[in-house]
């Protein structure tokens, strides 16, 4: 980011700050980051689609007028949600470097500046994973290699991975650190094959010091991706480089993952993160309020921590929702306001019935399939077995009749449902990995 853009934006937000209440400014304007300025077009990074919508409908003209007051120019404002993909797209558009080799800056490593060890809230549910991550960050490739972190959605896996990257770069700015999702790794591999750039792709991921791969479970079932990642893993490991991997489940429970990869993932340390307990949820809320400079009554945070239990994203999302509700309605934050703001979220969690649709969605996601696969006529094992599990769970967790369950799975006969239920029931008596899978699926279904 150039100095002129930074200085201009800082002056603009000082003008805007004088036009808004403290709550409105901290909620909507403070989180904006300028990205680029070209031909009177200003691109601003915002944290999510909800914030983008509010800014476009309520605050865009205010920003335009503040900039016009400073520069005598009318700028076109473009709000960009800062997902990995959009950050990467922005880099491609504004980075003059044409080489695929990674350079040492925060943007090239795709690290989120907010995800550091200092901003991570430690509790009983994540203490071990945090300690392992810090040990790896302090002594890359010497403590635990690879480090495999697993846990449910929104529990802090990605935060710890980014924190490791930041810590290493802070202590050794020359380190080549790359953070990538398994989906992005796959897409880059596909493009390298299509464009005949295999060498560049391999150089990018094998000539580095630290590789952080998020959501590794998504390479399961992708033979070419697994083949390439296997050789990438070997090259880095043999060169004594650090590998950190995250997943929503331990290696032994990732379906259709090659055994040679599974065994390598188990070479180092496996650390899990569980859902936060009440004390940790309270600490997370207080940390978020402090960082965002939000004045939230303690009893409101207790209310949120009592009602929202599943993950950190939902906790922080509930807090922002309450602040937004307060700002938009011009009402003080209280338990009554919090109850009103969260009524849809809380009531849906309390009253939502388990349905076959929910079961199919969870099972399909767990096994990296599409819901249509479970309903299809295909009988390959990687589809037939998850389908049988989904039928088993449908009979266990819903009141639907056998014919109705069969109908929801592509119009199958009720005898097929009976066969699936009996097969899974019998296998559960002797198959520990299946027991773990069913336990995890039940947990995810209950969180829906």
UniProtKB/Swiss-Prot annotation:
A single GO molecular function term of this UniProt record: lipid binding
Name of the protein in question: Chromosomal replication initiator protein DnaA
Example of a GO biological process term: regulation of DNA replication
The family this protein is said to belong to: Belongs to the DnaA family.
Name of one Pfam family that matches: DnaA_N
Region of interest: Domain IV, binds dsDNA: 327-448
Summary of the function given for this chain in its UniProt record: Plays an essential role in the initiation and regulation of chromosomal replication. ATP-DnaA binds to the origin of replication (oriC) to initiate formation of the DNA replication initiation complex once per cell cycle. Binds the DnaA box (a 9 base pair repeat at the origin) and separates the double-stranded (ds)DNA. Forms a right-handed helical filament on oriC DNA; dsDNA binds to the exterior of the filament while single-stranded (ss)DNA is stabiized in the filament's interior.
Record localization: Cytoplasm
Keywords for the protein's UniProt record, in alphabetical order: ATP-binding, Cytoplasm, DNA replication, DNA-binding, Lipid-binding, Nucleotide-binding
Predominant cellular place of this UniProt entry's protein: cytoplasm
GO cellular component, one term: cytoplasm
Domain of life where this protein originates: Bacteria
Domain writeup: Domain I is involved in oligomerization and binding regulators, domain II is flexibile and of varying length in different bacteria, domain III forms the AAA+ region, while domain IV binds dsDNA.
Region of interest: Domain III, AAA+ region: 110-326
Region (Domain II): 73-109
Sequence segments annotated as region (Domain I, interacts with DnaA modulators): 1-73
Subunit structure: Oligomerizes as a right-handed, spiral filament on DNA at oriC.
Species per Swiss-Prot/TrEMBL record: Clostridium botulinum (strain Hall / ATCC 3502 / NCTC 13319 / Type A)
Gene this protein is translated from: dnaA
Binding site for ATP: 154, 156-158
